[in-house]
Amino acid sequence: MNLVIDGGNTFIKTAVFQNNRLLEKQVFLKKDFFENFENLQKKFPAIRKSILSSVTSLDSDLENALKKSYSLLQLDDLVALPFKNEYATPHTLGKDRIALVAAAVNTYPGKNVLIIDAGTCITYDLKTEDEVYLGGAISPGLEMRFKSLHKFTANLPLVTPKPAPKLIGDSTESSILSGIINGIEMELKGTIKSYDSKFEDLTIIFTGGDSQILSIPLKNSIFANSNFLLEGLNFILEFNKTQ
């Protein structure tokens, strides 16, 4: 039984896997880690191994608690990966992007896959049918665009994102919604079209916190999966058991 931990700036996600099957997922504030960690230990005493991925430095007490309880793998650029990484600067590659590519290798082996993660940033990552990671693109995320428009102008308001805005805005608020939401959706469709023309039988994975607000046509080759990153971390942990 594995414990997967994905640490963000404010929140921590935990997931328990057994035989590659997700048993439970939790999301809580970083300050509430120890309370939730104790509950997890009581509920799942069979956990033996854990993987930790964090975008920030975690409290040393938190790391020590994990090391004391389990065999801990901390994701970094030196960890063995289940794919060939051709990123020119692997030490700068985000851990979330690594996990997403690993999930693509696990779920869609032998296929060309484009993973789109709509989070703080919108990231595009491509792995080939030969299990080679080529890289991708990073674009400003939904919230970042709304906040930037408000911060770097004198009079434009900070607008709350809403799905499916009309194309032609008839007020400042609706114009901002149209420009940002529709603009991102056009970016998504255009990027998918460009990748699709270069890679045969391309499968697209659409994930991330803002994937529910944004909409792209879910054709046969496009799949939404909110647990894709956690599944990728678990696959990396399983892969390293054999190394």
From Swiss-Prot:
Subcellular location as annotated: Cytoplasm
SUPFAM superfamilies per the UniProt record, alphabetical: Actin-like ATPase domain
E.C. numbers: 2.7.1.33
Cysteines paired by S-S bonds: none
Reaction catalysis annotation: (R)-pantothenate + ATP = (R)-4'-phosphopantothenate + ADP + H(+)
Residue numbers binding substrate: Y87, G94, K95, D96, R97, T172
Pfam families found in the cross-reference section: Pan_kinase (PF03309)
InterPro entries associated with the record: ATPase_NBD (IPR043129), Type_III_PanK (IPR004619)
One GO CC annotation: cytoplasm
Record family assignment: Belongs to the type III pantothenate kinase family.
Quaternary structure (record): Homodimer.
Annotated HAMAP family: Pantothen_kinase_3
Protein name stated in the entry: Type III pantothenate kinase
